[in-house]
Amino acid sequence: MKEVLLESREDKQQVYLPEKCIGCGTCVQICPKGELVIGSVGAVARRLIDKDFIEKRKSGACVFCALCARACPTGALEVRKAGTAEKDDSYLSVALQTTIVNEMCVHCGLCVEVCPQGCIEIKDRRLGEDGSLKMSGRTLIDLNACVHCGWCAAVCPSGAISFQKPFAGEFSRDDNVCQACRTCVHTCPANALFNKEWGPGEIVEKVSHRKDACIYCGACAQACPVRAISVRKIAIIPEMKGKKAFEKKLSDPAPWPTLTSLLKTDEDACLGCGNCVIACPVNAFSDPYLAAGHLNELDDKPLLEVLNGTMKVVNQEVCGSCATCAMICPAEAVWLERREVK
């Protein structure tokens, strides 16, 4: 598994495991020194920028308190002493009940189909040889990838799977602000957000929420380029040391993500079609007329514009780092690159 050494001091190391990170920003929310930075969550989740969710400032203010590692629901941060990670019941990822498959499992494979992380597999599955109408095999869960969403337990026909969620919380989304860019849908680690199918003339909400699947991590709110989503953690579910103090700190609204990307364009490749200008959720939020596709009737656009047949970046600083422009461009003429964290 990939490891990123964020900082080393004397015999202590702060290590980031990006493959376990879900981009929720809980570590950023709880850091008392503001040393950790999260940004470009949508672009990272969509694999449209070469960077990780989390970075660290180089101010030297970190006191190695390990609050970030203790609050992380997936164990993506570690504080090591002499090379050994600290792990006890003051760490949420340790206190969290392991997702377990018991002997009642019939190896049907439904859990494999619905797991949003693809972390379940069935090995050696075959018809039973004891004369019964049963399947034999081994159902295995990659605990490094499990996000404790509960999909597997919900669909299991024999009640063979037990799990525990990290947080209880509240989710809200402003339909008037949401631009249906689907960044949140692509980012959610638990497949708790989706777009309903609709028929001709039918009106449905832009994004729907599966309450029972949500782990209230807040990754969707971190990814939303127009800040239409709010997630509040109201309780930590597992029993862990220092639980009340963590709950108090995490009940505060999470800080907005830092802009850690730059929009880059290739003027020679650009077709001037304007797809990026219309699809950009920041542009669309500025004027519904623009969102409806009226590209040329509006003179002022906040982020992207087509001038003289070529796409131009109007203001880098208002970008939501969702990479919707890069997704829709037919000529790969716009992309995101990492911006250095100050």
Labelled PLM ranges:
Residues 26-44, 67-85, 110-127, 151-166, ...:
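Iron-sulfur cluster-binding cysteine motifs and their immediate structural context
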Residues 3-23, 41-64, 83-107, 124-148, ...:
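Ferredoxin-like iron-sulfur electron-transfer modules
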Residues 240-241:
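Post-cleavage N-terminal segment of exported redox proteins
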